Amino acid sequence: MSYPEKHIALVCNPTRENEKALGIANNIEVLLSGIDIPHKIFTSAWPESFDSFTEAWIIGGDGTMNWFINQYSEIQLPLALFAGGAGNDFHWMLCGNETTEQQVDHVLQSSPQLVDAGICNEKLFLNGVGIGFDGAIVHDLLGKKKLAGKASYLLSILKHIIGYHEKPCLLELPGETIKEDCFMISVANGKRYGGGFHVAPNAIINDGLLDVNIIGKISPIKRMKYMPVIEKGEHLDLDFIKYRQTEKITIHSPGKLHAHIDGEYFHTVRFEIDILPKRFSFLY
């Protein structure tokens, strides 16, 4: 099959810990060269724009993808994401467990599909925002070498699951206000984060909705008991969880809360989160 109209930018995670992503990028480059598709690879330096390309293929994890959409927030080109990070949760939403070779073949034959993005305090995300306990987990992992999949996440959970204290929160949704001491709040566009925790099993990336899970006060014993249930995405009917679907949510707390956005740590006292329907175009 011929692809004369294509000119693909291969964009690789520009960090010191990008050996996996570089290896995948080199593999993709070989595959594209073998079928004579014009392309250019970007590693340590990314261009100001991709206007001279027909597609941008990003090789990295959720953090790399998040950095890309915030750096190129108005990009109209079709995008593809290849799993070159530790968790790769958004990639899983798009492509499941495809190999690189399978995905290249699949992407080359795909038509662009529009997917939603979220925005939290003026920063875009694709996967979700985690506030409270899982934000504390991401904070604990700062500066540490990440293990593949959810191994790093699990180890940090075991370290903190007993001693973490719920934080007072005020949550405002259209037509509803919730005041509660919260162990954890997830506001998701995708189904999972943390390298495989299915925090929002009903989430769909093009339905124009955010999936919100609010976990209130929960004893240490219950935390240990139900964390595997949350990992599997079987938690929505538990009595200590409030589940909502919404287009927007605002969350306040008297003190700064640990949080992450697509796995990238931040902390604040106020979160303003909205869905941006059909914001980006992806090949999958």
Located regions from the model:
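Short acidic/glycine-rich loop or secondary-structure boundary segments that cap or lie
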Residues: 134-137, 179-181, 192-196, 220-223
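A generic structural signal for short beta-strands and their flanking turns/coil linkers
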Residues: 165-167, 181-183, 206-211, 245-247
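Glycine-rich phosphate/pyrophosphate-binding beta-alpha loops
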Residues: 130, 186-199, 265
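Catalytic core of DAGKc-family lipid kinases
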Residues: 5, 9-12, 74-78, 82-183
